[in-house]
């Protein structure tokens, strides 16, 4: 089982409690766990604190959520890149890429969602990009079988 959670930064304390109780269960926090460029440092730190748990993964997605509704179609999301960089610095390769389809069509194209990570996140190593773009999810699913 993979626990998939579409929560907010405020839910991280509860998520960490679940991670403590069930360390064998991978927890995947969708849409960067609801991070937004307008979040307080406290909320951002609360999400980053969850990186201390080996069973908590962060879904590398939600570009339009991270920027906010008024900045949709802002590819390649330069104004939000610092949040993705900070998340990578904390979670490392324990991230999983997501397209946000079909919601992505309201803020970018599928290709742009993919290229944001592949091309514009030069702070992520090639090896970790492979993990984030598919190997991690493959490994998580194979642990279930």
Give the predicted meaning of each segment.
Residues 65, 104-105:
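Short, active-site-adjacent cap segments at secondary-structure transitions
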Residues 100:
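Active-site glycine-centered loops adjacent to acidic/histidine catalytic or metal-binding residues
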Residues 58, 85-96, 105-145:
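Mid-to-C-terminal alpha-helical segments outside catalytic/metal-binding sites
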């Amino acid at each position: 089982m993979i626990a998939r959670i579409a929560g907010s930064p405020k839910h991280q304390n509860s998520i960490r409690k679940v991670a403590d109780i069930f360390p064998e269960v991978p927890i995947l926090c969708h849409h960067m766990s609801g991070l937004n460029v307008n979040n307080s440092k406290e909320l951002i730190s609360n999400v980053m604190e969850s990186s201390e748990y080996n069973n908590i993964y962060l879904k590398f997605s939600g570009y339009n959520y991270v920027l906010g509704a008024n900045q949709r179609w802002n590819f390649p999301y330069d104004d939000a890149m610092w949040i993705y960089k900070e998340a990578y610095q904390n979670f490392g390769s324990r991230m999983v890429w997501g397209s946000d389809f079909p919601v992505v069509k309201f803020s970018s194209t599928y290709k742009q969602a993919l290229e944001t990570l592949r091309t514009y996140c030069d702070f992520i190593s090639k090896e970790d990009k492979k993990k984030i773009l598919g190997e991690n999810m493959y490994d998580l699913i194979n642990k279930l079988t």
